[in-house]
């Protein structure tokens, strides 16, 4: 079966047909649920600011029948108010950059670019113990019980901890180690589990490729020397993390992780950007193969066979069988270009065929952008919530066409998504059904570089399905069988 939770987003879902929403990002690392205050770290001058109210986030999701994934800080400090900032120029002197709207808030770098050593975390923050987070999760669970409807499906253990010493260096200047990650995971996950035994716990929400294999301490030294990893049997950090949590589960009877959660962004030159030149667009589409294809060597500094989803599932199977796998953040860039839409459609299709459990697009595709229509192709292709179905069907396609097929429980209703990944040539698609079924009716919806929406080609009766797929196009076939 295809998981319904691979169609997630972080922001407002509108009519995209998204099924689940994530509360995350750098600001979530320092969110104080009592003060409704947060701090985006180096993203914005290490300034505290008013947060988005988590209660509204959850209430909105409940009203829309969406599940929620909410990030719980485990860094140990959260914003104490909505006004303080980490590197006042009045205290530290002139800095490389400053907030144009709050002139005393600096960026923590001297004019020559060297880093200023931070003051105590109390400059901006208060301690946030596991018990403080237990109180928050308890408040969430009690509110949902009161409302009589559950929205929170998973609690995510912070956000990209291997980057704390850069993104949040004013409160966590030292690079994260293997042992600190495990210690914080156990202490905070235990508190979450005690407060809401029904909730699923996801972690470690790491940023990308390097952080799957090395700790922040390793990368701060060098991955060649990798002192932290060598001190832990030279085992890559994610498999080590899973194995240690499995050991903890077996020794205590307390399961602290349900979902292996990582983030993934393509690293090829210009891919995760608005760039839409022909070369970058082609690379963007090829880069989606890193999600699944064992033969694809990533065309970036990674220069390795990523095969992300099979790799993560294999690590789980070996080190902590039974866990689900989530991409807590991902995007292939170029939201306003057809190549970005095709890459997103390719990703959504592969999530289904590869058996991914959860995925959350970062952030939300702009209304009527190609990425928006890629979501609509899978989740609301007719504007009336018709969608890709929940059982995957094996397909075979040649050339520059990707074909994803789904069926309902009866087997009499099929929805196909066909992508022509060639920018200049149309493709002939003769769709043949292996077996005894014949087509009663079919309807085609298509979107290409010249479209403003998915265009309905009209209901057609019977016969074969021979169609032309425009260059760089997303095509949905809604088929009823006899």
Tell me what each language-model feature is.
Residues 218-231, 275-295:
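Short, flexible helix-coil linker/hinge segments at the edges of structured domains or between repeats
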Residues 256-270, 275-284:
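Long, well-ordered, tryptophan-enriched scaffold segments
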């Amino acid at each position: 079966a295809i998981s319904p939770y691979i169609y997630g987003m972080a922001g407002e879902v509108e009519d995209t047909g998204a099924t689940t929403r994530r509360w995350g990002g750098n600001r979530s690392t320092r969110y104080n649920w009592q003060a409704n205050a947060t701090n985006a770290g180096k993203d914005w001058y290490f300034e505290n600011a008013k947060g988005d109210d988590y209660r509204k986030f959850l209430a909105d999701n409940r009203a829309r029948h969406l599940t929620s994934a909410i990030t719980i800080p485990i860094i140990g400090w959260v914003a104490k108010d909505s006004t303080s900032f980490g590197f006042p120029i009045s205290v530290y002197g002139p800095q490389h950059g400053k907030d144009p709207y709050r002139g005393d808030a600096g960026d923590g770098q001297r004019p020559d670019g060297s880093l200023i050593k931070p003051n105590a975390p109390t400059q901006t923050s208060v301690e946030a113990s596991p018990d403080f987070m237990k109180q928050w999760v308890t408040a969430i669970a009690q509110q949902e019980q009161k409302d009589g409807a559950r929205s929170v499906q998973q609690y995510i253990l912070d956000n990209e901890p291997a980057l704390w010493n850069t993104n949040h260096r004013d409160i966590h200047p030292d690079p994260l180690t293997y042992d600190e990650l495990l210690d914080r995971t156990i202490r905070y996950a235990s508190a979450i589990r005690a407060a809401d035994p029904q909730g699923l716990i996801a972690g470690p929400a790491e940023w990308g490729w390097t952080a799957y294999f090395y700790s922040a301490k390793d990368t701060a030294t060098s991955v060649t020397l990798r002192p932290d990893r060598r001190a832990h049997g030279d085992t890559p950090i994610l498999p080590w993390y899973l194995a240690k949590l499995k050991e903890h589960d077996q020794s205590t009877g307390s399961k602290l992780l349900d979902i292996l959660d990582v983030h993934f962004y393509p690293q090829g030159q210009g891919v995760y950007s608005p760039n839409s030149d022909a070369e970058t667009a082609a690379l963007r589409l090829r880069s989606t193969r890193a999600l699944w294809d064992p033969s694809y060597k990533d065309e970036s500094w990674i220069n390795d066979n990523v095969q992300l989803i099979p790799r993560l599932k294999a690590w789980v199977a070996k080190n902590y069988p039974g866990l689900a796998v989530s991409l807590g953040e991902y995007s292939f860039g170029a939201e306003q270009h057809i190549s970005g839409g095709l890459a997103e459609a390719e990703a959504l299709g592969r999530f289904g065929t590869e058996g991914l459990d959860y995925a959350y697009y970062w952030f939300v595709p702009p209304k009527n952008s190609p990425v928006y229509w890629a979501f609509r192709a899978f989740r609301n292709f007719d504007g009336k919530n018709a969608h890709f179905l929940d059982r995957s069907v094996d397909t075979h396609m040649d050339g520059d066409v990707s074909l994803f097929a789904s069926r309902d429980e009866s087997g009499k209703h099929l929805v196909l998504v066909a992508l022509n990944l060639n920018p200049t040539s149309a493709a002939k698609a003769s769709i043949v059904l292996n077996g005894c079924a014949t087509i009663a009716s079919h309807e085609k919806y298509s979107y290409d570089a010249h479209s403003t929406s998915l265009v309905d080609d009209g209901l057609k009766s019977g016969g074969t399905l021979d169609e032309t797929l425009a260059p760089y196009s997303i095509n949905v076939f809604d088929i009823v069988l006899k």
